[in-house]
Curated annotation (Swiss-Prot):
Any single Pfam family the record assigns to this protein: Ribosomal_S9
Any one biological process term the GO annotation gives: translation
A cellular component annotation (GO) from this entry: cytoplasm
Source organism of this protein record: Bifidobacterium longum (strain NCC 2705)
Ranges for region Disordered: 1-40
An example molecular function term from Gene Ontology annotations: RNA binding
Protein's recorded name: Small ribosomal subunit protein uS9
PANTHER family assigned to the protein according to its UniProt record, in alphabetical order: RIBOSOMAL PROTEIN S9, SMALL RIBOSOMAL SUBUNIT PROTEIN US9M
Family, per entry: Belongs to the universal ribosomal protein uS9 family.
Domain of life: Bacteria
Gene (name only): rpsI
């Protein structure tokens, strides 16, 4: 009689395992996340960005300047704003950013990572899958290779003369 109860438990466990799936939620990133403040830090090359997202109407403040003043390039503006556009949250958050170090491209990449991490902190369940799939939560670890002794640059060697 005890054997029969164990068999029924095994069958139930097998049914539970077949219902489990590792696929991401198709509804992720549909813009239904909670509207609350969030904070994230992003780094790229030598740039470090500290990003705070607060509920608002979509204003950007980067080191006390607007997004258009700080990044005149539309390409960099699009890169910085891409996590918010992906989650369809345009006009729902104001971004206050402090960024230093590096050049414009490195700073834009650092801000993008900071914004993505802030959105992830705001609503992990709704936002994480879409942000991760788009690659916004991955830190770009590429940095400038150091110059080596005896070479002109990191890999550029002096011209070779056979005779």
């Amino acid at each position: 009689m005890a054997e029969n109860t164990n068999d029924s438990q095994v069958v139930e466990t097998e049914e539970e395992l077949t219902n489990y799936t590792t696929e991401t939620n198709a509804g992720a990133g549909t813009g239904t996340s909670a509207i609350e403040p969030g904070y994230g830090t992003g780094r790229r090359k030598e740039a470090v960005a500290r990003v705070r997202l607060v509920p608002g109407d979509g204003k950007w403040t980067i080191n006390g300047r607007t997004l258009e003043e700080y990044f005149p390039s539309k390409l960099l503006q699009r890169e910085v704003n891409s996590p918010i556009v992906l989650l369809k949250l345009e006009g729902k958050f104001d971004a206050i950013v402090l960024v230093d170090g590096g050049g414009t491209t490195g700073q834009a990449g650092a801000i993008r990572l900071g914004v993505a991490r802030a959105l992830n902190a705001i609503d992990r369940d709704a936002n994480r899958a879409a942000l991760k799939k788009a690659g916004f939560l991955t830190r770009d670890a590429r940095v400038v290779e150091r110059k080596k002794a005896g070479l002109h640059k990191a890999r550029r060697a002096p011209q070779f003369s056979k005779r």
